[in-house]
Amino acid sequence: MNIRSFIVLLVSTLLLAASGHAQSNARENIPNFDSRKYHFGFLLSANSSSFFIDYKPDFSFNDSLLGIENVPQAGFNLALLASFNPIKNVNLRFVPGLSFQDRGLNYTYLSDGNKVETYLKRTESVWLQFPLMLKLRTNRVGNFAAYGLIGGCYGIDMQSQKDVNEAIAGKIVVKLEKTDITLDAGGGFDFFLPYFKFGIEMKTGFGMKNVLIQDGNQFTDPISNMRTRTFVLSLCFEG
Protein backbone atom coordinates (compact mmCIF):
# COMPACT_ATOMS: atom_id res chain seq x y z
CA MET A 1 0.00 0.00 0.00
CA ASN A 2 1.47 3.36 -1.03
CA ILE A 3 0.98 6.65 0.82
CA ARG A 4 -1.69 7.91 -1.60
CA SER A 5 -3.80 4.76 -1.15
CA PHE A 6 -3.38 5.00 2.61
CA ILE A 7 -4.61 8.63 2.60
CA VAL A 8 -7.67 7.66 0.53
CA LEU A 9 -8.43 4.84 2.97
CA LEU A 10 -7.91 7.19 5.93
CA VAL A 11 -10.30 9.83 4.55
CA SER A 12 -12.93 7.19 3.73
CA THR A 13 -12.80 5.64 7.19
CA LEU A 14 -12.83 9.07 8.84
CA LEU A 15 -16.04 9.90 6.98
CA LEU A 16 -17.50 6.56 8.05
CA ALA A 17 -16.47 7.18 11.66
CA ALA A 18 -17.89 10.70 11.60
CA SER A 19 -21.17 9.32 10.28
CA GLY A 20 -21.33 6.78 13.09
CA HIS A 21 -20.39 9.37 15.70
CA ALA A 22 -23.07 11.76 14.46
CA GLN A 23 -25.66 9.15 15.40
CA SER A 24 -24.43 8.94 19.02
CA ASN A 25 -27.33 11.04 20.26
CA ALA A 26 -29.78 8.63 18.63
CA ARG A 27 -28.33 5.33 19.85
CA GLU A 28 -25.20 3.76 21.29
CA ASN A 29 -23.53 1.33 18.92
CA ILE A 30 -22.36 -2.10 20.17
CA PRO A 31 -23.23 -1.22 23.82
CA ASN A 32 -21.82 -4.47 25.22
CA PHE A 33 -18.41 -4.11 23.56
CA ASP A 34 -16.56 -3.20 26.78
CA SER A 35 -18.10 -6.03 28.77
CA ARG A 36 -16.14 -8.65 26.80
CA LYS A 37 -12.68 -9.58 28.12
CA TYR A 38 -11.12 -10.35 24.75
CA HIS A 39 -11.18 -8.58 21.40
CA PHE A 40 -9.45 -9.26 18.11
CA GLY A 41 -8.75 -7.23 15.00
CA PHE A 42 -6.09 -5.89 12.66
CA LEU A 43 -4.16 -2.69 11.91
CA LEU A 44 -3.14 -0.98 8.67
CA SER A 45 -0.39 1.60 9.14
CA ALA A 46 1.89 4.04 7.38
CA ASN A 47 5.30 4.74 8.91
CA SER A 48 8.17 7.18 8.61
CA SER A 49 11.56 5.90 9.78
CA SER A 50 14.89 7.52 10.57
CA PHE A 51 17.80 7.35 13.05
CA PHE A 52 19.10 8.98 16.20
CA ILE A 53 22.81 9.49 15.49
CA ASP A 54 25.70 10.09 17.93
CA TYR A 55 29.07 10.96 16.44
CA LYS A 56 32.41 9.82 17.81
CA PRO A 57 33.73 12.43 20.28
CA ASP A 58 37.14 12.56 18.61
CA PHE A 59 35.70 12.86 15.11
CA SER A 60 35.54 16.21 13.33
CA PHE A 61 34.20 16.80 9.85
CA ASN A 62 37.09 17.54 7.54
CA ASP A 63 37.61 19.03 4.12
CA SER A 64 36.32 15.84 2.52
CA LEU A 65 33.28 14.83 4.61
CA LEU A 66 31.11 17.89 5.23
CA GLY A 67 28.17 16.30 7.00
CA ILE A 68 25.70 13.46 7.50
CA GLU A 69 21.97 14.13 7.24
CA ASN A 70 19.05 11.95 8.30
CA VAL A 71 16.57 11.35 5.47
CA PRO A 72 13.30 9.86 6.79
CA GLN A 73 11.66 7.40 4.40
CA ALA A 74 8.07 6.14 4.16
CA GLY A 75 6.89 2.58 4.71
CA PHE A 76 3.89 0.60 5.93
CA ASN A 77 2.83 -1.94 8.57
CA LEU A 78 0.42 -4.87 8.63
CA ALA A 79 -0.48 -6.32 12.03
CA LEU A 80 -2.95 -8.48 13.91
CA LEU A 81 -4.45 -7.38 17.23
CA ALA A 82 -5.34 -9.33 20.36
CA SER A 83 -6.66 -7.27 23.28
CA PHE A 84 -7.29 -8.33 26.89
CA ASN A 85 -9.48 -6.12 29.09
CA PRO A 86 -8.79 -6.98 32.78
CA ILE A 87 -10.53 -3.90 34.21
CA LYS A 88 -12.59 -1.03 32.85
CA ASN A 89 -10.75 1.26 30.41
CA VAL A 90 -7.48 -0.70 30.69
CA ASN A 91 -6.36 -3.00 27.89
CA LEU A 92 -3.27 -5.13 27.34
CA ARG A 93 -2.65 -5.39 23.60
CA PHE A 94 -0.45 -7.80 21.65
CA VAL A 95 0.05 -6.59 18.08
CA PRO A 96 2.32 -8.94 16.10
CA GLY A 97 2.98 -8.00 12.51
CA LEU A 98 5.29 -6.94 9.71
CA SER A 99 6.81 -3.47 9.36
CA PHE A 100 8.35 -2.48 6.04
CA GLN A 101 10.82 0.30 6.88
CA ASP A 102 13.27 2.34 4.83
CA ARG A 103 15.84 4.75 6.27
CA GLY A 104 18.29 7.03 4.51
CA LEU A 105 21.57 8.77 5.36
CA ASN A 106 22.89 11.56 3.14
CA TYR A 107 26.70 11.84 3.17
CA THR A 108 27.98 15.13 1.74
CA TYR A 109 31.56 15.19 0.45
CA LEU A 110 33.77 17.85 -1.10
CA SER A 111 35.66 16.36 -4.04
CA ASP A 112 39.14 17.31 -5.21
CA GLY A 113 37.68 19.79 -7.68
CA ASN A 114 35.78 21.59 -4.88
CA LYS A 115 32.56 20.01 -6.10
CA VAL A 116 29.99 19.05 -3.47
CA GLU A 117 28.73 15.49 -3.91
CA THR A 118 26.00 13.74 -1.93
CA TYR A 119 25.63 9.99 -1.47
CA LEU A 120 22.38 8.52 -0.16
CA LYS A 121 22.87 5.25 1.74
CA ARG A 122 19.55 3.51 2.31
CA THR A 123 18.84 0.73 4.79
CA GLU A 124 15.72 -1.25 3.93
CA SER A 125 14.26 -3.58 6.54
CA VAL A 126 11.33 -5.95 6.91
CA TRP A 127 10.73 -6.24 10.64
CA LEU A 128 8.84 -9.08 12.26
CA GLN A 129 7.57 -7.22 15.32
CA PHE A 130 6.14 -8.35 18.66
CA PRO A 131 4.76 -5.25 20.45
CA LEU A 132 3.12 -5.44 23.87
CA MET A 133 1.19 -2.26 24.67
CA LEU A 134 -0.79 -0.93 27.63
CA LYS A 135 -3.85 1.05 26.52
CA LEU A 136 -5.46 3.51 28.96
CA ARG A 137 -8.81 4.83 27.74
CA THR A 138 -11.26 7.50 28.82
CA ASN A 139 -14.86 6.69 29.62
CA ARG A 140 -16.98 6.18 26.55
CA VAL A 141 -19.04 9.23 25.56
CA GLY A 142 -21.72 8.06 23.17
CA ASN A 143 -19.77 6.34 20.41
CA PHE A 144 -16.44 8.03 21.09
CA ALA A 145 -13.44 7.59 23.44
CA ALA A 146 -9.80 8.75 23.58
CA TYR A 147 -6.82 6.73 24.76
CA GLY A 148 -3.09 6.70 25.43
CA LEU A 149 -0.55 3.95 24.70
CA ILE A 150 2.77 2.92 26.19
CA GLY A 151 4.79 -0.25 25.82
CA GLY A 152 7.67 -1.93 24.08
CA CYS A 153 8.47 -3.95 21.00
CA TYR A 154 10.98 -6.65 20.07
CA GLY A 155 11.77 -6.85 16.37
CA ILE A 156 13.67 -9.18 14.04
CA ASP A 157 14.84 -7.84 10.69
CA MET A 158 13.95 -10.49 8.11
CA GLN A 159 15.88 -8.57 5.44
CA SER A 160 19.02 -7.90 7.47
CA GLN A 161 22.22 -7.31 5.52
CA LYS A 162 24.35 -7.98 8.58
CA ASP A 163 26.21 -10.83 6.90
CA VAL A 164 26.23 -9.50 3.33
CA ASN A 165 29.46 -9.97 1.37
CA GLU A 166 30.33 -6.51 0.05
CA ALA A 167 32.75 -7.95 -2.49
CA ILE A 168 29.87 -9.84 -4.07
CA ALA A 169 27.35 -7.02 -3.58
CA GLY A 170 29.74 -4.61 -5.31
CA LYS A 171 29.02 -1.74 -2.93
CA ILE A 172 29.62 -0.58 0.63
CA VAL A 173 26.61 -1.39 2.80
CA VAL A 174 25.67 0.35 6.06
CA LYS A 175 24.98 -2.78 8.09
CA LEU A 176 22.51 -2.95 10.96
CA GLU A 177 21.99 -5.50 13.72
CA LYS A 178 19.33 -8.12 13.06
CA THR A 179 17.31 -7.37 16.22
CA ASP A 180 16.05 -4.23 17.92
CA ILE A 181 14.11 -3.24 21.03
CA THR A 182 11.98 -0.09 21.05
CA LEU A 183 10.07 1.94 23.61
CA ASP A 184 6.72 2.97 22.10
CA ALA A 185 4.29 5.70 23.15
CA GLY A 186 1.30 7.34 21.54
CA GLY A 187 -2.45 7.80 21.61
CA GLY A 188 -5.60 7.76 19.56
CA PHE A 189 -9.37 7.83 19.29
CA ASP A 190 -11.97 5.05 19.25
CA PHE A 191 -15.19 5.29 17.24
CA PHE A 192 -17.88 2.71 17.97
CA LEU A 193 -19.59 1.92 14.68
CA PRO A 194 -22.70 -0.27 14.26
CA TYR A 195 -20.76 -3.52 13.70
CA PHE A 196 -17.19 -2.92 14.90
CA LYS A 197 -14.89 -0.45 16.64
CA PHE A 198 -12.70 1.74 14.48
CA GLY A 199 -9.63 3.53 15.86
CA ILE A 200 -7.11 6.08 14.64
CA GLU A 201 -3.81 6.17 16.50
CA MET A 202 -0.40 7.80 16.29
CA LYS A 203 2.65 6.21 17.87
CA THR A 204 6.37 6.89 18.09
CA GLY A 205 9.01 4.21 18.60
CA PHE A 206 12.44 4.95 20.10
CA GLY A 207 15.20 2.38 19.64
CA MET A 208 16.93 1.36 22.87
CA LYS A 209 20.07 -0.26 21.42
CA ASN A 210 22.86 0.66 19.05
CA VAL A 211 22.01 -1.08 15.77
CA LEU A 212 25.04 0.08 13.77
CA ILE A 213 27.66 -2.53 12.87
CA GLN A 214 31.10 -0.91 12.72
CA ASP A 215 32.75 -2.08 9.51
CA GLY A 216 35.61 0.43 9.49
CA ASN A 217 34.54 2.18 6.29
CA GLN A 218 33.98 5.85 5.48
CA PHE A 219 30.24 5.59 6.16
CA THR A 220 30.44 4.06 9.65
CA ASP A 221 33.70 5.56 10.98
CA PRO A 222 32.20 8.95 12.00
CA ILE A 223 29.34 7.35 13.98
CA SER A 224 29.55 5.90 17.48
CA ASN A 225 25.89 5.11 18.09
CA MET A 226 22.83 4.81 15.88
CA ARG A 227 19.35 4.04 17.19
CA THR A 228 16.10 3.69 15.29
CA ARG A 229 13.22 6.16 15.38
CA THR A 230 9.82 5.44 13.84
CA PHE A 231 6.56 7.37 13.58
CA VAL A 232 3.45 5.29 12.84
CA LEU A 233 -0.10 6.32 11.88
CA SER A 234 -2.54 3.41 12.16
CA LEU A 235 -6.11 2.50 11.34
CA CYS A 236 -7.43 -0.08 13.83
CA PHE A 237 -10.37 -2.40 13.17
CA GLU A 238 -11.55 -4.34 16.21
CA GLY A 239 -14.50 -6.63 16.79
What are these regions (language model features)?
Residues 1-27, 237-239:
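Bacterial Sec-dependent N-terminal signal peptides
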Residues 22-74, 238:
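Short glycine/proline- and aromatic-enriched beta-strand/turn motifs that initiate or cap beta-hairpins
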Residues 22-25, 80, 131-136, 187-188:
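Short, well-ordered amphipathic alpha-helices
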Residues 34-38, 46, 50-52, 81-162, ...:
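Gram-negative (and chloroplast) outer-membrane scaffold detector with strong preference
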Residues 50-73, 101-127, 155-180, 210-230:
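Extracellular/periplasm-exposed beta-strand and loop segments of Gram-negative cell-envelope proteins
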Residues 180-185, 189-239:
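Predominantly the C-terminal beta-signal and adjacent terminal strand-loop region
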